[in-house]
From Swiss-Prot:
InterPro entries, sorted: Domain_X, Maturase_MatK, Maturase_MatK_N
Function, in words: Usually encoded in the trnK tRNA gene intron. Probably assists in splicing its own and other chloroplast group II introns.
Keyword entries, A-Z: Chloroplast, mRNA processing, Plastid, RNA-binding, tRNA processing
Protein name: Maturase K
Subcellular location as annotated: Plastid, Chloroplast
Gene name in the database record: matK
GO BP of this protein: mRNA processing; RNA splicing; tRNA processing
Organism: Elaeagnus umbellata (Autumn olive)
Keyword Chloroplast: yes
GO MF annotation list: RNA binding
Keyword Nucleus included in the entry's annotation: no
Length: 505
């Protein structure tokens, strides 16, 4: 937003609602080009400048409003210089420019909402591991949890309708509608894989913008109800949602849902105590109350998706589990609540008592079987976990091979440093170390035993992780303290992405 704020010259008369003229401004596509298109393989052999990019987009928008948009006239010299008609390239240019423009109202609303308040920049909250300390504090006091897959709209028109609440410019929304219908096969954009939606590699920034707008709308309603549950008792759709296009279409279904399902049990809304966590394409709802509360939220979510987002969701696929009896697969960990039993001796005057003390603790375990399956898919071991050589890396240098294995080993060690039990992590590191040795032995046409005997175990010093080195420097003389800290949980607050090996959910 700061890059092109000087170009916009927006005043207080809500000029930012008119976004359509920005599609024909050259600097918009200069920003988009610098952000993404400069790294695109489609432009490697093409002389691209801001002027030609602007003219190409202008021609493309004009063609989108006519039926014969695939015919290139003799006067389109810029298109001819750019090469023959390339549908993917034009789609890339339009989508990147569209994201730059559509982010303007979101950024302006954020700035206006934070005006007069101090903006606290907490970069550590961006880390994936920042969620786990929250779970350690909250989950031991909760009873029930539901792991829900967030459904995605099956039709692009729903996304256009969602953006109408944020963008008031009808021309821009009309252009978005034309673009989605002409240049995208919606079924190929996202594909369900193990209940997690994965975007195609085409225009990732554009698709992430659409996805985030959809999730933002969904979570704004959900969190509004979570924070103010008394609003669920309202029977009028007009006073429930401030969504213009929502009233006429599904007023009857909204009244039916909230009158029949919610107002019959007013005590249900007095103390919801609901916690919400979202990660990737899933969300977690956890509560301390009875299963009735969880079932009410379950069917509310289903009605919300079907009536508001026109997305079908099966109630049988939303499971409500008791935390003390079921584990939760969350961000590559098996998380569960474990009871730590201890006996405390209490003495009062001459009488002594033995008191059983039970404390709940969040147990985070390394999923050994899925990780071995991921290692087997990448040819580090077989299906049983026996290490094998990585033949595709045998042509690289020795240092390159060691660096590759050590990099994977360090990443896994950092990510699973918060595990309650490290034995599974040690087994994964052992598989990678032995696979590295077998790869080097294969390269030098030698056996593993002869190779290690000739070079020694110092060859694998690269596999020592950073936390081992740092803790050994902090506690050089207290070996027992060093081992105790290393065996404990260490949450790294600088992890912004998940390794492919961990991405097994």
């Amino acid at each position: 937003m700061e890059e092109f704020q000087g170009y916009l010259e927006l005043d207080k008369s809500r000029q930012h609602d008119l976004l359509y003229p920005l599609f024909f401004r050259e600097y918009i596509y200069a920003f988009a080009h610098d952000h993404v298109l400069n790294r695109s393989s489609l432009l490697e052999n093409v002389s691209y400048d801001n002027k030609s990019g602007f003219l190409i987009v202008k021609h493309l928008i004009n063609r989108m409003y006519h039926q014969n948009n695939l015919i290139i006239s003799a006067n389109d010299s810029n298109l001819k210089n750019f090469g023959e008609y390339n549908k993917n390239l034009y789609s890339q240019i339009i989508s990147e420019g569209f994201v730059v423009i559509m982010e303007i109202p979101f950024s302006l609303r954020l700035v206006s909402s934070l005006k007069g308040t101090e903006i606290v920049k907490i970069y550590k909250l961006r880390s994936i591991h920042s969620t786990f300390p929250f779970l350690e504090d909250k989950f031991p006091h909760l009873n029930y949890v539901s792991n829900v897959s967030i459904p995605y709209p099956i039709h692009p028109e729903i996304l256009v309708q969602i953006l109408r609440y944020w963008v008031k410019d009808a021309s821009s929304l009309h252009l978005l509608r034309l673009y989605l219908h002409k240049y995208f096969n919606w079924n190929s954009i996202i594909t369900p894989k193990n209940s997690v939606f994965i975007f195609s590699k085409m225009n990732p920034r554009f698709l992430l913008f659409l996805y985030n707008s959809h999730v933002c709308e969904y979570e704004s309603i959900l969190l509004f109800l979570r924070n103010k549950p008394s609003h669920l008792r309202l029977t009028s759709s007009g006073s429930f949602f401030e969504r213009i296009f929502f009233y006429a279409k599904i007023k009857h279904s909204v009244e039916e849902v909230f009158v029949n399902d919610f107002s019959v049990t007013p005590w249900f809304f007095k103390a919801p105590f609901m916690h919400y966590v979202r990660y990737r394409g899933k969300s977690i709802l956890a509560s301390k109350d009875t299963p009735l509360l969880m079932n009410k939220w379950k069917y509310y979510l289903i009605h919300l998706w079907q009536s508001y987002f026109y997305v079908w969701s099966q109630p049988a696929r939303i499971y409500i589990n008791q935390l003390s009896k079921h584990s939760l697969i969350f961000l590559g960990y098996f998380s569960s609540i474990r009871l730590n039993l201890s006996v405390v001796r209490s003495q009062m005057l001459k009488n002594a008592f033995l008191i059983d003390n039970a404390m709940k603790r969040l147990d985070t375990l390394v999923p050994i079987s899925p990780l071995i399956g991921s290692l087997a898919k990448m040819n580090f071991c077989n299906g049983l976990g026996h290490p094998v050589s990585k033949s595709i890396w045998a042509d690289s240098s020795d240092l390159d091979i060691i660096d590759r294995f050590a990099h994977i080993c360090r990443n896994l060690s950092h990510y699973y440093s918060g595990s309650s039990k490290k034995k599974s992590l040690y087994r994964i590191k052992y598989i990678l170390r032995l696979s590295c040795v077998k790869t080097l032995s294969r390269k030098h046409k030698s056996t593993v035993r002869a190779f290690l005997k000739r070079l020694g175990l110092g060859l694998l010093e690269e596999f020592f992780t950073e936390e081992e080195e740092i803790l050994s420097l902090i506690f050089p003389k207290t070996y027992s303290t060093f081992r105790k800290l290393y065996r404990g949980r260490i949450w790294y607050l600088d992890l912004f992405c998940i390794n492919d090996l961990i991405n097994h959910e």
